[in-house]
């Protein structure tokens, strides 16, 4: 969309489009998670926060500025992104059991089915085109394109023989609830998130590095419900809509750089881990 806005002609090639993508499943909130290098992701994330904050004031974007509570079992230093978010404060009282500290702040929640629909309409209105197809590699692309932007995510591991790419398996539960505040425990060993949206609440989660399994796990389901209800007890009896599973596109560091492959100028843009909408 930014390329179209700046006068470029753009064609997207993809094997799948919404609603059949990993992005459609994502809980999707602004929060730097499983991404590096921090000195770059903090800058990118700061810019994204401002964009999402502006989008929250527009109709049909699916972006909502949401009061958020992040809980810790040990005392923490202030996060590097403290100055980016609205209304940041640290609390040490009135916390769920076993937690000793809480960061309270306002951050965007992005309801991905709505946001992807809004992006598609914006893209179409600017004259962008779509092609549903796959590519075996980057060596034999048509000469009709001046620049190729590689956003193939997890598939970059195969297409580019990139050994730094790995899956981070996630599983969530959608439940019915009227909650309006978000609750998080973003430590990998106790990962928990309760993300309110317009018609449901997303409960998570897991972040299983190197796990390619796309089957739903009963053990993960039970663990998610236990962790979330330990923070918000009424979720124990919430009506369950469905369970979903997908793979985050992990990498040791985000790859954003230019490379010449054959006669093509390729801009690599992948490895965003659990920070897709944040970056």
What do these predicted regions represent?
Residues 5-24:
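Glycine-rich FAD pyrophosphate-binding loop
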Residues 27-32, 66-72, 157-186, 225-236:
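Central beta-strand plus flanking loop segment that forms part of the substrate or channel wall
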Residues 37-47, 102-118, 215-220, 273-279:
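Short beta-strand to alpha-helix junction loop
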Residues 47-126, 251:
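Flavin (FAD/FMN) cofactor-binding and adjacent substrate-gating region
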Residues 54, 165, 179-181, 198-202, ...:
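Flavin-binding catalytic cores
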Residues 118, 238-279:
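C-terminal catalytic lobe of FAD-dependent flavoproteins
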Residues 128-143:
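A conserved short coil-to-beta-strand element within the FAD-binding core of flavoproteins
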Residues 145-147, 151-157:
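Glycine-/small-residue-rich beta->alpha transition segments that form the dinucleotide
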